[in-house]
Design a protein with these regions (language model features):
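Membrane-interface "cap" regions at the ends of multi-pass membrane proteins
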Residues: 1-42, 46-51, 63-68, 79-80, ...
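Helix-loop-helix connectors at the membrane interface of multi-pass transporters/channels
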Residues: 4-8, 88, 115-135, 167, ...
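Extracellular loop-to-transmembrane helix junctions
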Residues: 16, 39-134, 138, 247-252, ...
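Membrane-helix boundary/coupling elements in multi-pass transport proteins
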Residues: 79, 102-117, 220, 225-233, ...
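TM-loop-TM module centered on a large, flexible mid-protein loop between adjacent transmembrane helices
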Residues: 85-88, 92, 124, 243-307, ...
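Membrane-interface loop-to-helix entry segments
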Residues: 119, 132-190, 217-221, 244-248, ...
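C-terminal membrane-solvent junction of multi-pass transporters and transport-like membrane proteins
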Residues: 160, 333-345, 383-434
Length: 460
C-alpha cells in the first residue's frame, strides 16, 4: 500500500516538508538554466551553427528520460531525499557506496568551481577585492540560508531562479520585436533568414557537431536536483510529476527560444565567441549597461547553483553517514544528526568547509592546475552516476516494489537502454576535446579503481 503524506509533516528520515509547490516548480524551471547559456552560447554556436538547436533538443530529451526514471522511483518512495538511495537498494551496497561518495565529491568540486565563478563576477565591479574574501562571505551567507529552514532556502532559490527566467524571456521578447520590425544591426537586419540562409547540418564538420554534445550535456548538469527537493514538499506525489512533465516545454522555451532569438538577430558566424550574446543583443537595443546587467544575472545564477549545491551536498553526506553507522569520524562529527528544524546542519557545515578550501587553493602555486584536472574528472564521474541510476531503474521495474499505477516511465524497455547508450556516447565525446581529454582519463581511473574498491569493501 502506498504511503500518504500530509503538509508540514516530517519524512521518515526526520526532515521537515517545508518546501512549497511554487518553490519546486520554479526550481524545476530555473534548475535547467546555468551560467553556460548566458556566457557560453556564443562558443557552442561557433561549433556547429543552427544545428546546435538539435543538440540541445536531443540532449534535453535524454535528460528528461533520466528524470522520468528518477521520478518513477521517487514517486514510489517519496521519503527518499536522494536518488542515490535507489542505486544502493537495487544495485547493491558496493555501487551505492561508490555513487554516494562520488556524487558528494563531484558536487563539492562543482561548488568550488561555482564559488570561484562568484568571485570572478564580483571582481568585475570590485577588482581590488581579494577573491578569497568574496568567496568566504558568499559561502557563509548561503550556508546560513541553508541552515535556517528549508522554507528559507526555497524562497531564496525562487527569486534567484526568477532573475534567470525574466532575463531569458526579455531576450526572446527583444528578438521577436527586432525581427518583426526588421531592426537594423551591425550585420544587416534581424530576420529568421539569418538562420535558414546557407544552412548546413555540419558547417564545421561532424566532429565539431559531436563535440557540442558534451558541452551541452554539462549545461544541463544537476537537472536531477528538482527530484531531490520534492521529498521536502508537503505533497511530493502531487508536485513531482508536474515538475518533471514540464521539463521538455521549458527546454524548448528557454534554451531553444533563446538560441533562435540570438541567431535571428545576429548571423551565428559573426557572433563573438568570447563575449556573451546576451550582452551583444541588449547593447544593440540601446541598453548601455547590458554588460553589468548580464554580470549581475550570471552572478545570481552562480550563487543559485552554489546554494543548491550546499543543499544537495548536506543531504547526501547525511545519508552517507546514516548508512555507515560504524564510522568513528562521522559519529564524532555527528554528520548523521538533524537540527531542531529538521535540517542536516552538521553535514551542510562540513560540506561548506570543504568547499571553502577552494578560496585558498587558487592562490597556491601549481595547485590550481591540479584543481582544474580534478574538477574536469568529476564531470565524467557524473555521467557514470547517471548510468548507474538508469540501471537501478531497470532493476526496480523488475522488482516486487514496482508501482504500476505510479508515475511510470513510458516504453522503459527501449528508452532506458537508449538513454544509457547516449550517456556512454557523451562520455566518449570527452576524449575528443583537448580541454576535457585529461579529465576524461582521470574520471575513467576513478570509476575503475574506486568502483573496484567500493564493491570489494562491501563484499567482505
Amino acid at each position: 500500500m502506498s504511503k500518504k503524506h500530509h503538509p508540514g509533516e516530517e519524512t521518515e528520515n526526520g526532515m521537515v516538508r517545508g518546501l512549497q509547490n511554487r518553490h519546486v516548480q520554479l526550481i524545476a524551471i530555473a534548475g535547467t538554466i546555468g551560467t553556460g547559456l548566458f556566457l557560453g552560447a556564443g562558443r557552442s554556436l561557433s561549433l556547429t551553427g543552427p544545428s546546435i538547436i538539435l543538440v540541445y533538443m536531443l540532449t534535453g530529451a535524454f535528460m528528461y528520460l533520466m528524470m522520468r526514471a528518477i521520478g518513477e522511483m521517487l514517486y514510489m518512495d517519496p521519503d527518499q531525499h536522494t536518488f542515490i538511495n535507489f542505486i544502493t537498494k537495487y544495485l547493491g551496497k558496493g555501487w551505492g557506496y561508490f555513487s554516494g561518495w562520488s556524487y558528494w565529491v563531484s558536487l563539492v568540486f562543482l561548488g568550488m568551481a561555482e564559488i570561484t565563478a562568484v568571485s570572478n563576477y564580483v571582481q568585475l565591479w570590485f577588482p581590488n577585492w581579494p577573491a578569497w574574501q568574496i568567496q568566504i562571505i558568499f559561502l557563509a551567507l548561503l550556508s546560513c540560508v541553508n541552515l535556517i529552514a528549508v522554507k528559507v532556502f526555497g524562497e531564496v532559490e525562487f527569486w534567484f531562479g526568477m532573475i534567470k527566467i525574466v532575463t531569458i524571456l526579455a531576450l526572446i521578447a527583444t528578438g521577436i520585436f527586432m525581427v518583426t520590425t526588421n531592426f537594423e544591426t551591425p550585420a544587416g537586419h534581424a530576420s529568421l533568414t539569418n538562420i535558414t540562409n546557407g544552412f548546413q547540418m555540419f558547417p564545421n564538420g561532424w566532429v565539431k557537431f559531436v563535440m557540442a554534445f558534451q558541452m551541452v550535456f554539462f549545461a544541463y548538469q544537476a537537472i536531477e536536483f528538482v527530484g531531490i527537493t520534492t521529498s521536502e514538499t508537503a505533497n511530493p506525489r502531487q508536485v513531482l510529476p508536474k515538475a518533471i512533465k514540464e521539463i521538455p516545454i521549458r527546454i524548448v522555451i528557454f534554451y531553444v527560444g533563446a538560441l533562435v532569438a540570438i541567431m535571428a538577430i545576429f548571423p551565428w558566424q559573426q557572433l563573438p565567441v568570447n563575449k556573451s550574446p546576451f550582452v551583444t543583443v541588449f547593447q544593440m537595443v540601446g541598453i548601455k549597461w547590458a554588460a553589468g546587467l548580464i554580470n549581475f544575472v550570471v552572478l545570481t545564477a552562480a550563487a543559485s547553483s552554489l546554494n543548491s549545491t550546499l543543499y544537495s551536498t548536506g543531504r547526501h553526506l547525511y545519508q552517507i553517514a546514516k548508512e555507515t553507522p560504524n564510522s568513528k569520524v562521522m559519529n564524532r562529527l555527528k554528520l548523521n544528526s538533524l537540527s531542531r528544524m529538521g535540517i542536516p546542519s552538521r553535514a551542510i557545515i562540513f560540506s561548506a568547509i570543504v568547499v571553502a578550501v577552494s578560496a585558498f587553493i587558487n592562490v597556491l602555486p601549481g595547485v590550481s592546475d591540479a584543481f582544474a584536472l580534478i574538477t574536469a574528472s568529476s564531470s565524467g564521474v557524473y555521467i557514470a552516476i547517471y548510468i548507474l541510476t538508469m540501471l537501478a531503474h531497470l532493476k526496480y521495474r523488475k522488482s516486487k516494489e514496482f508501482m504500476p499505477d505510479g508515475f511510470v516511465m513510458p516504453a522503459y524497455k527501449v528508452l532506458n537502454p537508449l538513454t544509457i547508450v547516449f550517456f556512454l556516447f557523451v562520455f566518449v565525446c570527452l576524449f575528443l576535446q583537448e580541454s576535457t581529454y585529461i579529465g576524461a582519463i582521470g574520471a575513467t581511473i576513478w570509476i575503475i579503481l574506486f568502483g573496484i574498491y567500493s564493491n570489494w569493501k562491501h563484499s567482505k
